[in-house]
């Protein structure tokens, strides 16, 4: 395959679509991803047209996926839709019914192996939902799914009398002195507790491990984070790079 061939990577999420153009070569993992965002697949026509291959991941988003399939067929550009697998890229999935593991989690687990400084690591994705996935060696051991910061806050406001909040997104954890702050800080504390519990599980298995944090909510815990925390904004796209060589 020519080193000049282009591939378009797509992470089709709930809020927006992340895209990155890469040159297909063995050195692609060493190069930084230049990521752009849009909210509709239809806006990607020119990027697709300029590519020799499209590699995409989507959790749900059926209409967007159908449109992507149609565009790629029209422009005669091969499309690979990543799926969770029982075993791939030397990683074994913990789920018996592996197809029910979100492909975003699967790709993040695969990508994190290239980042982690240790054999054991956990991937924390902070978003609408917070997820945790634990890996030792080439084995995904499973994980957790919990409400994310905004979901917790909205649920408190909706289901609890005389509790209210604002749209502030705290980047430090302090004690609230009014209800608004108590709600925001309490939800932030819950996120921190989620990560703390994940670390406890890691310590039960390995003395040395890495915590890799991704997702839009990572700003909540970046300040004063321990040295063994590694932050990455685009783990799903990084995981999609593996599909360029299958």
Swiss-Prot record:
UniProt keyword list: ATP-binding, Coenzyme A biosynthesis, Cytoplasm, Kinase, Metal-binding, Nucleotide-binding, Potassium, Transferase
EC number(s) per entry: 2.7.1.33
Disulfide bonds: none
Obligatory cofactor(s): NH4(+); K(+)
Residues that bind K(+): 125
Reactions listed under catalytic activity: (R)-pantothenate + ATP = (R)-4'-phosphopantothenate + ADP + H(+)
Transmembrane region(s): none
Chain positions recorded as ATP binding sites: 11-18, 128
Binding site for substrate: 95, 102-105, 179
Keyword Aminoacyl-tRNA synthetase attached: no
Pfam families, sorted: Pan_kinase
Family, similarity comment: Belongs to the type III pantothenate kinase family.
Official protein name in the record: Type III pantothenate kinase
Organism field: Pseudoalteromonas atlantica (strain T6c / ATCC BAA-1087)
Lineage: Bacteria, Pseudomonadati, Pseudomonadota, Gammaproteobacteria, Alteromonadales
């Amino acid at each position: 395959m020519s080193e000049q061939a282009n591939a378009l990577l797509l992470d089709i999420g709930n809020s927006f679509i992340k895209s990155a153009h890469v040159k297909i070569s063995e050195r692609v993992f060493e190069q930084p991803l230049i990521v752009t965002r849009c909210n509709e697949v239809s806006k990607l026509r020119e990027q697709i047209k300029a590519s020799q291959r499209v590699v995409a991941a989507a959790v749900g988003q059926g209409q967007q996926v159908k449109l992507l399939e149609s565009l790629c067929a029209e422009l005669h550009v091969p499309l690979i839709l990543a799926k969770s697998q029982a075993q791939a890229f030397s990683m074994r999935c913990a789920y018996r019914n592996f197809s029910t593991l979100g492909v975003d989690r699967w790709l993040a687990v695969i990508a994190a192996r290239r980042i982690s400084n240790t054999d054991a690591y956990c991937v924390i994705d902070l978003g609408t939902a917070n997820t945790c996935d634990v890996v030792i060696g080439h084995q995904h051991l499973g994980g957790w799914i919990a409400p994310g910061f905004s979901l917790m806050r909205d649920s408190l406001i909706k289901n609890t009398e005389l509790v209210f909040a604002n749209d502030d997104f705290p980047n430090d954890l302090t004690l609230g002195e009014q209800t608004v702050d108590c709600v925001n800080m309490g939800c932030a504390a819950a996120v921190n507790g989620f990560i703390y519990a994940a670390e406890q599980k890691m310590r039960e298995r390995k003395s040395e491990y890495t915590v890799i944090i991704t997702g839009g909510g990572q700003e909540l815990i970046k300040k004063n984070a321990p040295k063994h925390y590694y932050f990455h904004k685009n783990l799903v796209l990084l995981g999609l790079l593996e599909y360029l060589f299958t």
